[in-house]
Structure formats: structure tokens, C-alpha cells
């Protein structure tokens, strides 16, 4: 474990976005037995400027904070899971977020989690199964936490943790 002090995480919500490959009802277990929920939000560039600025500022502040705490140490910067892309000839801001579905805490107790789901009016979805038909192209908003991290073997970056989807 390292002894760095991290800057505070941010809780953010995207503007209206097109959801790409949402796995929000059942966790994706293809690459890990614990599974994880995930979604990629594709936001038109003109609507994403404020969100992009906030994420970029957090990323730069995190790198500056680590450098200030250890001026002689070199930090490998991990490519963030957000950025601008050209999709079908249109500039878009994409953001990929995920959440672990289950695991074990430090005391050995099992835990499980799932993202909160809300309908278009903001009311919680009571029957998740009714959303099973949701797939790429669905329009929604994604709430997430942007958390700075540093692992010496991996590097420094920002992880985006899924919290809720409307």
C-alpha cells in the first residue's frame, strides 16, 4: 500500500447520452466470475464540454498532487476511460463506467451491489426485469464517481464507478 494522499473524488452525472452496450440488469461475467455492471455513454461534443472539463481538471489535479508529494518519483499515467472520439463523422465525448457486482470485504464477508435504476420521471424502477430489452441506442443519463488512484505496478489514473442510470 502506498502512503499518498489522494484528492477528493467527484460525483458527476452526464447530460443526456446514447448508451452503448449497457449491462445494467445482469452483471457481465465473461471476464470475471464476480461480474460487473457496465455502460458506455456517448454524448454529443457540444453537450459534454462542462463534464469533460471537470474530468480533465480532476485528472490533472491528481497528477499534480502525486508529483508534489513525491517530486523525484516518476508516475506512469494510465489512459483515462473517457475522451473525445469521432463517431459516424460527429465529434462525441465517450465515457465508460463500471461497478463490481459482488466481492468480499476485508473481514471476509460477501457483499453484492447493483446500480440504481430510474425511469424518465426520476422514480426508482421497481421491477428491473422490465428493462431487460434495453440495449445500445437507449437514451439516458449516467451518475458516477470519478475516483483518483495510484498503484505503483499499474500507474496513476482516474477510475469511474457507476452509481445510477436514468
Residue ranges and their predicted role:
Residues 17-21, 72-74, 122, 139-146:
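A short linear-motif detector with a strong N-terminal bias
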Residues 101-122:
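Short acidic, glycine/tyrosine-flanked loop/strand segments centered on an H-E-D-like triad
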Residues 115-140, 147-158:
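Exposed beta-sheet edge/beta-hairpin loop segments within beta-rich domains
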